[in-house]
Amino acid sequence: MTSTVTVAPPRAETWAERLWAPVAVGDEDTAAAVVRAAHGAGLDAESVLLDVIGAVQRRVGAEWAANRLGVAQEHAATAVNEQCVGVLRHSAPPAVPAPGAGRIVVACVDGEWHGLPARLVAEVLRLRGWHVDHLGAQVPAPHLIGHLHRTGADAVALSGSLAPRLPVAHATLTACQAVGVPVLVGGAAFGHDGRYARLLGADAWAPDARAAADRLARGPLPPPPRDHVMSADLPHLADQEYTFVTRSRQELVRAVFHGLLDRYPPMRAYTALQREHTAEDLDHVVAHLATALYVDDADLFTGFLGWTASILAARGVPAASLLPALAVLAERLRDFPRALGLLAAGTEAVRGAESGGAHAVRAAEPLPGAGLIPGAEPISGADPLRDEASRDADEAPR
């Protein structure tokens, strides 16, 4: 008597582990073969997208944060994952939209360069039978609105990973609503619980691509409110603290930079390149302070500092290296009570990280630079001395 043993096909976690090896070394051909094999073995396309490619991309972020991948390696790995999405698109063509299927525009907030999350959302929606216009990263609001007028879209899915772009996201979603198109938002910028989506008046929020597709499948988003006034969402902005910090961003970065030369002695030995990276990191701190003022939420600022402390710890730099920068900022902003409150909370968060160990790295967060670390290269291409701050301030509700 013989028996037949049925061997279950590998699970998504197994395929993610197999994909990791070629992605980590930038091997596009082998990575593509793994994706084809996963789908060919019976794993549905949505799971390949989210539980294999998406899982590997989260690991890429975690490995960079833990200082096990360099910036160039992180960029190469992300590029391979982008290629894998395209490979799957050819292996598993999306469903043909049914007659009357809705049209969803998927776009990233202007200034948002993390484009892969939005692309995953777009591909999942295509697989589920929607007409999808994927506009990619860094979409200026006027161009998005023009596209809505031309296409008659039913909804916008707006993606944002960078918290400092929340004011721009607010202006963008309000502009979409003004032309009658509801907006679903998602991404780390809107908070792990969607708190900033609700604060800024988004019509819906989703924590991930599946949840976004499920929400849209349940029925149309509610029609946007008529005559929505942005300033009504954020009455605390009347104190002008956000506007001042944003418009003074370059000056504040310079002041903190020069203050650190006296208060953080290791910086005196930095090379010109290391000093440039430090200026970029200080710009991140000021940008997150301004955004915390915009949403009036200390958690945004303390969370960023705790995460930054973990990045520094992974590179052998004490979290206390952040304290002099916060002290100089407090001196410069002594006449701004909300800013002082945020800086005090941030100081306590850094001290807590220093005494109790750095916070666990959150791979879903956007990755700032690490210029306080000698020899480190920041991932951001932002120039802290470039005058873009005034534009963001002008987009704030009056």
Label every PLM stretch briefly.
Residues 78-104, 118, 153-155:
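Accessory recognition modules or surfaces
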Residues 340-372, 377-398:
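Short terminal or interdomain "cap/linker" segment that borders an active site or interface and mediates
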Residues 1-91, 252-304, 308, 312-324, ...:
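Long amphipathic alpha-helical segments
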Residues 231-246, 279, 304, 309-316, ...:
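Globin-like tetrapyrrole-binding proteins
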Residues 126, 134, 138-196:
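Cofactor-cradling patches in redox/metallo enzymes
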Residues 99-134:
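Glycine-rich active-site/cofactor-binding loop and its immediate structural neighborhood
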Residues 247, 268-271, 384-386:
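N-terminal intrinsically disordered, cationic/polar leader segments
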Residues 189-242, 383:
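Peripheral docking tails and interdomain loops at the edges
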